[in-house]
Amino acid sequence: MDIGSGTGGTGLHARKHHKGSAHHQGEDTDDSHPQSPHRRRMTVILPSVVNAKNRKRRLDSIFETWGPNARAIYVVHNVSEFPQADQHALVSEKSQPEDPYSYPQILLVPPTIGIDDGLPRLNYVIRTVYEKVNPDFAFFVNDHTYVIPEHLCKYLEDKHPEEHMYHGHAMKNQKDVFNSGAAGYVLSRKTMQSLVQKWDQEDPTCLLKNGAKWLQGNPGLVTTKCLKEVLHVEAVDTRYHGKYHRFHAFPLTRIVSGAVDDWYKKKHEDMDKLMKTDKSYNNLDSGVGCCAQDTISFHYVGYLESRALFSTREALIENPHMTDHELKSLMIAKWPKDFKDIGGYSRGLPKEKSKDDWEPLLTVMRRISSRHTQREC
């Protein structure tokens, strides 16, 4: 996929032209930011704790779909997790990529940090991204997340890297507000720099050296506590027009149908009081009201669903006049059908004759596949 005119790199393989790119807008992406467009933002992909045995398939799928355009950096404990990157795209304690314009890259965690050491791993990753990659913004997700990088670029158009930023899908944990790691969250350069400074100072709120097992599995909660109590940086309402969510912790089919877990719904109750937003945040809309046109992420998206969602969006961007019948037929042809391929946390497409279920799904699919929301950065 093309990541912008004149950017200089060819990636791991010859990139496919991305139909949703700024070329449709006639934009010159080279002048969109005073720095190299390669450094405007990165997407950092941490290991998902769900269905770890299929991780390599998910990484391969991300590489073949949205990963290169998102400037994906895979966090790995061993280079064998994604051997395609090889040495030329390796970020580690002792090396940087020979070709900084090649994506995905891999960020190799040192052997002193184990697979279950979530806290030191997240700290190491944020530090390494800040010190060795130094993007304006970094979007932190895991390998079950599906990202629409052009929409992330659109969202960041009016944001500034030297201002604090902790943006994602805000939810509550008792009386604290945090951003879902599943839906992903964006940190600005200033915020990453401030976190690293607090770790270097061994601030007791920010640097938990012996965190409990539960916190090792949820390290973002410690980051949130540091951001709020020490740096005074809080999660914010990132919905479009204060109504439509951009970052989603469930896949498209479950978000549209409203078939999300009860725990997820409860984490939105009374959010208007905790985050000083309006009461509409307390309830998750389903159907056509579920998703912003510039939706940035979905979660629990398996490797086959990732390919299906990517190819469907590409087809709609290329041919926005596709009929509903054609779009429905395309989705049925592309989407995984067997439970083992869909995954336990996702859902398949509606039954073919279920008009009431298909209508909102087709509407949302069109909404998130508009040429008008595609940006490069």
What does each model-identified segment do?
Residues 15, 214-377:
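C-terminal catalytic/acceptor-binding lobe
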Residues 79-135:
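Active-site-proximal specificity loops/subdomain of glycosyltransferases
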Residues 137, 141, 145-252, 257-258:
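Conserved catalytic core of nucleotide-sugar-dependent glycosyltransferases
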Residues 61-71:
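Short, acidic, metal-binding catalytic loop of nucleotide-sugar glycosyltransferases
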Residues 71-81:
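Short beta-strand/loop segment that forms part of the nucleotide-sugar
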Residues 58-63, 86-91, 99-103, 120-123, ...:
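Short coil/turn segments at secondary-structure boundaries
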Residues 2-20, 24-54:
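N-proximal low-complexity "stem/linker" segments adjacent to membrane-targeting elements
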Residues 54-58, 114, 118-122, 148-152, ...:
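Alpha-helical interaction elements in eukaryotic regulators
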